Each structure stands twice: as C-alpha cells, then as structure tokens.
Amino acid sequence: MPEFQLQRRLAADIAGVGLNNIKFNPERLEEVEEALTREDIKKLIKERAVIVNPKRGISSGRLKERKHKRRSKGEGRKHGSRKGKSGARTGDKEIWINKIRKIRRYIRWLRDNNVIDKHTYRLLYKRAKGNYFKNLSDVKSYLRQMGHKV
C-alpha cells in the first residue's frame, strides 16, 4: 500500500491532528493519489475517502479519582488551598441557619430549665428571628442586662 506522505501531511494539517490519525479508504486510493492540493484533500475528507480519527486528549479521570480520595480524608481543604472569602465557601444562608439553630436551641433549653419564663422566651425567639442578636454570646449578654443569671 502506498504511503501518500503529502496527502497524509496535508490532511493532518487541515484536520489539526497528528499524522497517525489519518486513514485512507482502501477502495478510493486512486482518488487520494491524485489529490495534490489542500482543496482536493478537504473535498476527500468531506466525502470520507480520507478518514480523520479524532484527536485523543489526556484523560483526567484517574487524577479526579485520586483528588477525591485525598479530599475525603480532609487533605487539600486547609488554609493554603483556600481561595476566596469565607463567605464564598459557606453561603450566607448556611451561616444564618447554623446561627439561628444554635440560638433557638439555647433559649429552648433556658425555658425548659425554668431559667426564663415563656414570655421572655417568646420575646427572645422573635428577636432572634429578626436578626437582633449577632451570636450566642450576644444573647447571653442581653439576658445578663435584663437581670437573668446565665
């Protein structure tokens, strides 16, 4: 079988692949042999007389698998690998949910252990919902100012 070096080189250049990714249809070798210009080769590629195998990339599957394994152990999640603000890693909603759950849990405990009465509980609950308290220590200092022993 002839090598068709010129045709192979032109086809590889046109398709943007390596020389080994170019194959010729065995039934149409005479047409391929006559093709000497880029236009001829383009026409033959369209007619499937010159077959172009797609370019093969480098698979990143194994890399992703390895990274996932390391991340599940907690590697690559510490300060040196972090980019962006803390708010980019944990959203505002998640921060709010954690804060409100903590405060509500605490004031529920106070009510159940008779440290505060149900009216004070309701007042604190409403204020917590309205974002009156910055954090749990803010709730505690508010209660101290109200005269409760916390």
UniProtKB/Swiss-Prot annotation:
Keyword hit for ATP-binding: no
A Gene Ontology BP annotation from the UniProt entry: translation
UniProt keyword list: Ribonucleoprotein, Ribosomal protein, RNA-binding, rRNA-binding
Protein name (Swiss-Prot/TrEMBL): Large ribosomal subunit protein eL19
Pfam families tied to this protein: Ribosomal_L19e, Ribosomal_L19e_C
GO-annotated cellular components: cytosolic large ribosomal subunit
Function: Binds to the 23S rRNA.
Subunit-structure text: Part of the 50S ribosomal subunit.
Gene of this entry: rpl19e
Family in the record: Belongs to the eukaryotic ribosomal protein eL19 family.
Keyword DNA repair: no
Domain of life: Archaea
Annotated GO MF terms: large ribosomal subunit rRNA binding; structural constituent of ribosome
Region span, Disordered: 56-90
